[in-house]
Amino acid sequence: MQILLANPRGFCAGVDRAISIVENALAIYGAPIYVRHEVVHNRYVVDSLRERGAIFIEQISEVPDGAILIFSAHGVSQAVRNEAKSRDLTVFDATCPLVTKVHMEVARSSRRGEEAILIGHAGHPEVEGTMGQYSNPEGGMYLVESPEDVWKITVKDENNLSFMTQTTLSVDDTSEVIDALRSRFPKIVGPRKDDICYATTNRQEAVRALAEQADVVLVVGSKNSSNSNRLAELAQRMGKTAYLIDDANDIQEAWVQNAACVGVTAGASAPDVLVQNVITRLKALGGSDAHELTGREENIVFEVPKELRIDAREVQ
């Protein structure tokens, strides 16, 4: 059984930055450090940080006065940000800069009095945070997930519309929704640069190449990870059996016993240690040494907040 690895896979710059912010805060200030929502959607990462003293909460009211609070990589609404400001808290923002870019687009539309349409998944924390950047009572903010949704919404002024997208969507699905938006609202204005982030796009491109060669595709990522789910769905759309797994323990021998080639990739919030454990498990089931496919090189780095960088050097 051949083992193929997608390239690129695993951590993106935004996830690296978010985890570093929590780790640095723990190293500098000591436990406990409060984090609003899971800092990234990966069970292994969250459990590891929890063991070191991170406390994950959903409501600002759960954070005691004087504590340190970190916003997750998914971003928060202005209401949440304002609530935190009203408290005696030290706040660090781990929002991915590429999510912040979308926040700025929404805020700009709100200031201009444009109505805004967000393409995204209802209930996802990134969507909640992005929708929460719109505050113009004279306008409106709408959420759509599919081309069908586009034809159901009612706007006030079809000539003063803009759209944005969640950063972790399926590139193909989003393209269909954008086509529907442009068809229904010919004057709608989109972002100058795609909102779907480079890491999401690159990992979907990589899983396409992987699925062309593999009989079975294993996607390492947690069930609540949007970008990981999109990778599994893409492989399935290409006619391949695909499984979303948290770790190597999820792999069932029956999944791969008749496979000549098993492909492995990982969502943007899944650490490489989990991929290595999957390779070890597959080898135990008869797999050969893993071979990595060629793919796009990623050199993007997002710095942690200045305060944490300075404090981190002092600690060292």
UniProtKB/Swiss-Prot annotation:
Reactions this protein catalyses: isopentenyl diphosphate + 2 oxidized [2Fe-2S]-[ferredoxin] + H2O = (2E)-4-hydroxy-3-methylbut-2-enyl diphosphate + 2 reduced [2Fe-2S]-[ferredoxin] + 2 H(+); dimethylallyl diphosphate + 2 oxidized [2Fe-2S]-[ferredoxin] + H2O = (2E)-4-hydroxy-3-methylbut-2-enyl diphosphate + 2 reduced [2Fe-2S]-[ferredoxin] + 2 H(+)
EC number: 1.17.7.4
Keywords in alphabetical order: 4Fe-4S, Iron, Iron-sulfur, Isoprene biosynthesis, Metal-binding, Oxidoreductase
Pathway: Isoprenoid biosynthesis; dimethylallyl diphosphate biosynthesis; dimethylallyl diphosphate from (2E)-4-hydroxy-3-methylbutenyl diphosphate: step 1/1; Isoprenoid biosynthesis; isopentenyl diphosphate biosynthesis via DXP pathway; isopentenyl diphosphate from 1-deoxy-D-xylulose 5-phosphate: step 6/6
Cofactor section: [4Fe-4S] cluster
Pfam short name (any one): LYTB
Residues in coiled coil: none
Active site annotation, chain numbering: 126 (proton donor)
Binding residue positions for (2E)-4-hydroxy-3-methylbut-2-enyl diphosphate: 41, 74, 124, 167, 225-227, 269
HAMAP family xrefs: IspH (MF_00191)
Described function: Catalyzes the conversion of 1-hydroxy-2-methyl-2-(E)-butenyl 4-diphosphate (HMBPP) into a mixture of isopentenyl diphosphate (IPP) and dimethylallyl diphosphate (DMAPP). Acts in the terminal step of the DOXP/MEP pathway for isoprenoid precursor biosynthesis.
Official protein name in the record: 4-hydroxy-3-methylbut-2-enyl diphosphate reductase
Species whose genome carries this gene: Cronobacter sakazakii (strain ATCC BAA-894)
